[in-house]
């Protein structure tokens, strides 16, 4: 049922199918004409950016400069970003902020319909101070004498005023006199000095916004924002911008892993900027107001949250589809680049669109919410940005990918031919098939393509220049169309309490004392600069002259070219055009060179063709080998490298792991496939191993990442081993199904019959008498007496304590239980015995032994040499009396009492027959043979099956199956027991990490380490092994006693011979 459910769940729905079809159609059209798509998108984005720039920056600067030139001051310029406060009985004599900034009052005159007794304006004049600048005392005297309507109030110093060396003066003036006061404060001449305080940007030559002045203005605005911001806000924004740039870095690193060092990541960022321009255009056209401050604060958060995962996923899918088209399994079915892109969109397109839809829906919900502040406006803008980003991903970025893949393919196919031409070898041109974007082309087509590329970029630059030439002739003509832009990009309102708190306190005291209702408009700080008067006069004179000498068209063009962003974009576009054309011109030149080579005769062409192809292929493969890009070669090429000895077969996993688009599992599976081919084609064994490549030994759908470096080397596949479940069997009061991996028929069935008989008597009972793994190193000394001294020291309490301390320091689970030594001439054998937790423990105890021997050398035995860390005194994987007597691993005894009725009904025999059989066969017969630990029927069968099923070391079956089976007649019932002193199992490490074996451990409930008592899981597994042996011994002895063993094996475990014909 599981496969059916999976299939049903994976079936795409109607929306999925039709959405993917639409995406495929869009991408297909973009891939047919990728250059047109790129140029049109860039042209639209540039036009959008230019309109935004003209409406927000250029026209604003032009208006301000023209007004200053005519000495006409516009109060609305100073009111932008201001805030209005009111005080009176209606506000309970508390300052209340109006909902809208003063910049909106010009648009909505109804704002002033609510009359008040007094309407004041608070002006903060900011002067930079330094050691060379004169003081501002003269400025204060000038204000007192010349501005009768203005009053000095307490200034509010900024937290960062001392850092930036600024001094301010705060004035309170009637709102009706604001324009007059501002006009008189444009310039404060210094008496007996050649300098004067001049209002920033006042009186400059109307020559357009220079780059240096623009940068200074931006820097000053930035500093002003910092001075009036809280420290925590600054820290948060710094962290946001840092995280945003880390996101950019992650994008470049991800694209570099996919094989692109710069261009793909750059294209993703460029697509993001285009989306921002389009989103701003739609937002401004919709009348939604979003300030530049809000953009600068929220855009980093949007970049961090959304990220660039979608373009990376699409790129990875396209590269994978392109790589699959070059697999050796389908040498004649290579996809074109548009086909590879279409396959990638079929796989990932719908998921990407679904993610975009979810994000846009969340932003749309935020845009329609009633949350106070700028969040709804920014959500509206962000939703449009993501919408355009999704459209550009499947048009603009898909075109970039198409061009990138085509250029890579052209270079890959042309490099071998270039190598041949350098050696004066002709390959002919009959079979050369040059395809660009899936269509067959000639050299003339490529030349025409280059012309269109260059012409397209030149055309769009000319159009942009023309649009600007005729666009800024009169600012007033354009203002109705750009009003929305001006509203959108206007400065954010200031915080009046940070700018003029002390001045507001003075007004509050006066108004409350006189009981006068008051409205106060707090203007943003007005900056002043110190200028030379002579230079100021020259600038005033040069203004009209500049306008006269230069035409309006030329001024607009120069102003546009001086813009810091547009100029960079023009340079970037021209550079991109140059790079693309360089690639295409090289491809066209190589193609033309190839067509100019005329073969002398058909015989020469045919003879040269094969040899030249082989030579070119060999050179290309060798070059990629030297560059460390073997994983990008085809399988057949890698096989040839292995057979030539250029690549070691055992290192294929490490080599394939470097593939940029393959997962680690896919790379390892590919390595196994290649190694099978190498083994099959190795010349020295090809007569016997040639069948492996196409044999039925499986190698796919297996997790080789778990095997690599842990379980096996030189992997050529895996062998499915049948696994049966015997039982259930009650062991110490709990039911278990016992997994057995075996190819011997009747074994699982026999064990299941034994389980049934044991359950009839209440189940099996197990006990563990000992738990300790052993390791016996061999030590050599210069003389027998030195070996004896070492033996005495090891057997002493002091020696045991020192060795135990050193041994136990190597692991938190290893605890030395005992030492046993034996001397043979100058050789000394020491048997370490230690607990090892839930691990089988061979590696753990070996590490402890090495540490103990190292410490022993420092206690008077520096002349000792270690022959081997294992001296066969352990004893490991060999039958030995010492294991039978002292035990190794888990020493387990299991017993069961079988009722006489169950013996007759289930086992088909009687108690006395079983007792006599066991005595004669298992005890006397094994003694006659001189067996060590072999006093059983077939304990090794059961032990090996359980060890294989649970991921144990199968070789440990040699000592683990040491067993003595005892049967007794107790009150006409059968009492059976098995004693097994050397069960060596673990539940962590080794083969237990493999998924199938781990699943069998889960079946027994003993997977991994025990959570509270280390070692309990491994001991429980040893109990289960002993109980399984108990069931197997019981059933097989019964079959022997009843004479059923041979007939059962003949019926279930004998190969059927094919019938003879003819």
Curated annotation (Swiss-Prot):
Enzymatic reactions: (R)-mevalonate + 2 NADP(+) + CoA = (3S)-3-hydroxy-3-methylglutaryl-CoA + 2 NADPH + 2 H(+)
Q: Which GO terms describe its molecular function?
A: hydroxymethylglutaryl-CoA reductase (NADPH) activity
- Binding residues annotated for CoA, in chain numbering: 750-756, 906-908, 1048-1049
User: Topological domain, Lumenal: which ranges?
Assistant: 56-230, 283-287, 376-377, 472-564
InterPro entries membership: HMG-CoA_N_dom (IPR025583), HMG_CoA_Rdtase (IPR002202), HMG_CoA_Rdtase_cat_sf (IPR023074), HMG_CoA_Rdtase_CS (IPR023076), HMG_CoA_Rdtase_eu_arc (IPR004554), HMG_CoA_Rdtase_N (IPR023282), HMG_CoA_Rdtase_NAD(P)-bd_sf (IPR009023), HMG_CoA_Rdtase_sub-bd_dom_sf (IPR009029)
Q: Active site at which residues? A: 744 (charge relay system), 877 (charge relay system), 953 (charge relay system), 1049 (proton donor)
Q: What pathway is this protein said to act in by its record?
A: Metabolic intermediate biosynthesis; (R)-mevalonate biosynthesis; (R)-mevalonate from acetyl-CoA: step 3/3
Entry protein name: 3-hydroxy-3-methylglutaryl-coenzyme A reductase 2
Q: Which organism is it from?
A: Aspergillus fumigatus (strain ATCC MYA-4609 / CBS 101355 / FGSC A1100 / Af293)
